[in-house]
Amino acid sequence: MASTWAFEAQGPGSIPGGGASYTSFMSLETVVVLAAGEGTRMKSTTPKVLHEISGRTLLGHVLHAVSGLKSKNLCIVVGAGREHVEAHVAQIAPHAITVFQEHRGGTGHATQLALAGTSSLGTSSQGTVLVLAGDTPMLTGASLEALLDVHHKGKFAASVMTAEHPDPTGYGRIIRSADGSFLRIVEERDASDEEKAIYEVNSGVYAFDGVKLAAAIGKLKNDNSQGELYLTDVLEILRNDGGSIAAVLIEDFIEILGVNDRAQLAESAALLRDLINDNLMKAGVTIVDPISTWVDSTATVESDVTLLPGTWIAGSTKVASGAIIGPRSTLLNCTVASGAQVIESHCTGAVIGANANVGPFTYLRPGTQLGASSKAGAFVEMKNAVVGDGSKVPHLSYVGDATIGEGSNIGAATVFVNYDGVEKHHTTVGDHVRIGSDSMLVAPITIGDGAYTAAGSVITEDVPPGAIGVARAKQRNVLGWVLRKRSGTQSADAASRHDDGKKG
């Protein structure tokens, strides 16, 4: 019988005896990601691996984990929702190839298809083949590196990543000999009561000698209750053929957690939230309420940022040191400069300058650029608008398709009227302009430097620099109108008392 070995990774990217050396990763020939599952328990028209948490799809998290391994080939096995998954892969991993598993045949069958697919492209069977599932979003590149380092240094036929799970129900158990050596994997349905009491479980992540895998995988049989080919059976075939097997125990079981339903999706999202927030706080970010604060794995938050309760930093958002975000704010694909403050606002695709102030209840849409020390205040909506340094839109305004210079002030309830029913038009407001409250700026127009508009004006023509634009009807007071037209009302009574007082 061939020898088998057990190792424990003492931390991400490490193995017993010292830090991992990854120079041997040049022999990593192929990474195979199994993403063909139907995901019926998700009860969704969206393929399981395309459900999102923390800024990436489940598959996206896995591909991110393997991205630093520098394999020669990346093969993704697709099945349910093939077209959607392939389109997503083309977007986030254009160098990858996909193979289609038309009928459910098990993990062994999926791996057979992957090997055949890469072989058809002239890929060598030499080197290491890494196989993992596409629904394990917590898996880290460091743990994969630890597995590969053990595998390469020991020249094993196969190495399997394992973890100790506090609730191992549903997982294949790792069976070891008296000396701790790896013996086999027993699936839950086949395990005895004694074996079910084992907490060490199979992660579904394997490193194989490519030549030996190619020879062994053809020997798989589907004589089991599911009628499928199990990749786990390859380990036993390799042992029987004289190969040595390593079991590499990683430190944190959450890395191997798969997602099969909405509850597990939420659980993984919360675990990833906690991990990200913990790392941010250790790096100098203040998070007042970590439970209600969500930062996507794709976002960047610098030290000395303060995140207040109910905040979501999403997508590719970057928040610079000294900024204060929240409470109850969302930033999606935004850039926030140092010292800026965003209060109770929703911002998408916006650039917020240094020491700028946003909110409360502000909606910044794509194309918005706020200069340094500028302001987009309460109940303001902006879209495709550039606001110069020191300019302010304090409240109750819509600014769309506009350029505002430096030091200008836009009065309350101003509307940049940009749409004529067919096309959008641009408004240009110069430096140190004062727009009166309740002005309508009907594009396309230009308000020159230092110009004013009178409150309540509907501006339809350019206002020259230094001029004031007045576009409103002259006020006319009709005396006695209320007593004549609204007699018997409280208003008429009040007016009558006023008249009586004057007579007295």
Question: In which residue ranges do the predicted regions lie?
Answer:
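Glycine-rich hexapeptide-repeat left-handed beta-helix
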Residues: 335, 342-504
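Conserved alpha/beta core of the MobA/IspD/sugar-nucleotide pyrophosphorylase nucleotidyltransferase superfamily
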Residues: 27, 199-302
